[in-house]
From Swiss-Prot:
Its EC number is 6.5.1.9. Catalyzes the formation of cyclic 2,3-diphosphoglycerate (cDPG) by formation of an intramolecular phosphoanhydride bond at the expense of ATP. This is Cyclic 2,3-diphosphoglycerate synthetase. GO terms for biological process: gluconeogenesis. Belongs to the cyclic 2,3-diphosphoglycerate synthetase family. It comes from the Archaea. The keyword Membrane does not apply. It is found in: Cytoplasm. It catalyses: (2R)-2,3-bisphosphoglycerate + ATP + H(+) = cyclic (2R)-2,3-bisphosphoglycerate + ADP + phosphate. Signal peptide: none annotated. InterPro entries: Cyc_diphosphoglycerate_synth. Keywords: ATP-binding, Cytoplasm, Ligase, Nucleotide-binding. The keyword Nucleotide-binding applies.
């Protein structure tokens, strides 16, 4: 069955004609506009199907879809009643409800969302470089207090077949990771990073392409989930890639928003879809934005999903080795993050004597490394070229490699660790 979106800028006879040509229409949603209609009751009588309306057209559309056996929403409206922004809001709601949204020259079709056999949590993002893997590692090691999690990742450099890393059992040394890189694998993939930083079992999967709503074009996550369900672990964490995430209806969703992202990407496009999914929302790098932008992000979230638990956080580097008394070369993906990271590491007893923010730019990174002098160790995030360039460079020169985790720390007075534990307990309790 179909629901149609209509407005008062079309004559009722024209709307009735279009509904008849479409066929299989169960109801209509009135979006606004009064130029060519009388009362809504008269419009309903004219078009011959039940008419839903509300001051908020999204509320009316949601009721229409939930109260009827709707598979498709067909847009028979137009400007000025509907703007491009409105249409993306409608598309986001349709993705959330699992129905197709079709207009004269566009179609948005949701992927069928599968269910995991075991309790599960999705960690998704609003884009790349928002700190999703760092947060995923934090979530995984936090949930070890109440569960035995396994993390299933998807990435553009992931393996063709799911790759199991038993992070609970093996130690991921720089030498081991370099050996993996020399075998032609992406040793800084998310499943290696999660296993290294959190000592949990991980499963790495490949994906290619990402749609506007966040679904991958190709991936092998189904095989990864099947492997995860065969293990003795009792909680599956599905980690997205960039703005793309596995097509699973998990028991809970954690959304990562980068504080430096444009707010247009949150209130527009498919930002509302991701926000509406979330039980817990973590804004990272909040210390790099002003209070006005934090307030704007809060307002957007509260308008779309007021029930979500919202946290504003900053990243603090957590060295996975002893740095006290050592002269460090510091290598990160973000140039802007270097000053605070340097200050934090020096507060732990190190002396940072050289830095590079070009971890994701191999040619510039190699130039930076050649300028490093007088260091005992190199501290590097496990991302991008951390293994095949930085680790290789350091080990060839007898320089110690210390990998860095980025740990989210609240700057809003809330307790993210407590919220993650509560969410994990709720998810486990639902399947008990």
């Amino acid at each position: 069955m179909r629901v149609v979106l209509i407005d008062g800028e079309h004559y009722p006879d024209v709307t009735k004609w279009a509904i008849h040509k479409l066929g299989d229409v169960c109801c209509a949603v009135f979006l606004g506009g009064t130029e060519k209609i009388g009362s809504l009751k008269a419009l309903e009588d004219k078009i011959g199907v039940p008419l839903y309306h509300s001051p908020n057209y999204l509320d009316a559309l949601k009721r229409a879809v939930l109260e009827n056996d709707v598979e498709e929403v067909v847009d028979l409206s137009d400007e000025p009643v509907l703007t491009y922004e409105d249409r993306f809001r409608i598309a986001s709601l349709c993705m959330l409800l699992g129905v197709t949204y079709r207009g004269a020259d566009f179609t948005f079709t949701p992927k069928p969302l599968k269910k995991t056999k075991k309790p599960s949590i999705s960690i998704i993002g609003t884009g790349k470089r928002v700190g999703k893997t760092a947060v995923s590692g934090f979530v995984a090691r936090t949930l070890k207090e109440v569960a035995r999690p396994v993390v299933v990742t998807m990435g553009r450099g992931g393996p063709e077949e799911p790759e199991l890393i038993e992070g609970e059992k093996i130690e991921l040394t720089p030498q081991f990771l370099l050996k993996v890189a020399k075998e032609g694998k992406h040793a800084a993939s998310d499943h290696f990073e999660d296993a290294l930083t959190s000592r949990v079992t991980t499963i790495g999967c490949r994906r290619c392409g990402g749609g506007m709503a966040g679904f991958p074009f190709f991936d092998v996550v189904d095989k990864g989930v099947e492997l995860a369900e065969s293990l003795p672990h009792d909680l599956i964490i599905l980690e997205g890639s960039g703005a793309t995430f596995p097509a699973y209806r998990t028991d809970a969703y954690i959304l990562i928003i980068g504080g430096r992202q444009k707010t247009d990407f949150l209130r527009g496009y498919f930002g509302p879809f991701r926000i509406a999914l979330a039980d817990l929302i973590i804004v990272t790098m909040s210390d790099e934005i002003n209070p006005e932008k934090r307030a704007e992000i809060r307002k957007i979230v509260e308008e779309i999903n007021p029930k979500a638990d919202l946290h504003f956080t900053a990243f603090r580097p957590r060295p996975l080795g002893n740095i006290s008394g050592k002269k460090l070369g510091l290598v990160m993906t973000s140039q802007s993050a270097l000053p605070k990271a340097k200050e934090h590491l020096e507060g732990l007893g190190a002396e940072v004597v050289a830095t590079s923010g070009n971890l994701s730019n191999r040619p510039k990174l190699r130039e930076d490394l050649e300028k490093f002098r007088g260091i005992d160790a190199v501290a590097v995030e496990l991302k991008a070229a951390a293994v095949d360039v930085v680790t290789k460079w350091a080990l060839e020169r007898g320089i110690e490699v210390i990998y860095l985790d980025n740990e989210p720390v609240n700057i809003d007075g809330k307790d993210l660790r407590k919220s993650v534990l509560e969410l994990g307990k709720r998810v486990l309790g639902r399947r008990a």
